């Protein structure tokens, strides 16, 4: 089964995604509500998929992915959670696997 983390500043959205992933038999390793703790975690842990919100307060999801590329122990697949198509297009430029 694939492993994943969620990086989503909105608690309710993170919870909804958590339930969906568990129903799909995805092993959820962690949920983060801020990008910086997630980056620190990724520097020492491996995960298959990162579900990341684009509109986060500290650093946006696009910058978050740029930092993952520089610091992650292993490069995970990235799936962005966004309601805006223009964000999705930019995400694909950064090699996102998909968006929700």
Predicted regions span which residues?
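Non-catalytic signal-transmission and effector/linker regions of two-component phosphorelay proteins
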Residues: 1-3
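Conserved beta-strand positions in the Rossmann-like core of class I SAM-dependent methyltransferases
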Residues: 5, 29-30
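Conserved acidic carboxylate
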Residues: 8
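Charged phosphotransfer/docking patches of two-component systems
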Residues: 11-15, 88
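Acidic, metal-coordinating helix/loop segments flanking the phosphotransfer/catalytic sites
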Residues: 18, 22, 31-49
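A generic structural motif
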Residues: 24-29, 74-76
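CheY-like receiver
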Residues: 39-41, 45-100
């Amino acid at each position: 089964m694939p492993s994943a983390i969620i990086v989503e500043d909105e608690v309710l959205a993170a919870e909804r995604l958590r339930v969906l992933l568990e129903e799909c038999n995805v092993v959820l390793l962690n949920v983060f509500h801020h990008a910086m703790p997630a980056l620190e975690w990724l520097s020492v842990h491996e995960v298959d998929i990162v579900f990341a919100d684009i509109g986060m307060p500290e650093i946006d999801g696009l910058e978050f992915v740029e930092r993952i590329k520089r610091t992650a122990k292993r490069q995970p697949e990235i799936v962005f959670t966004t309601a805006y198509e223009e964000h999705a297009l930019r995400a694909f430029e950064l090699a996102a696997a998909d968006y929700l």
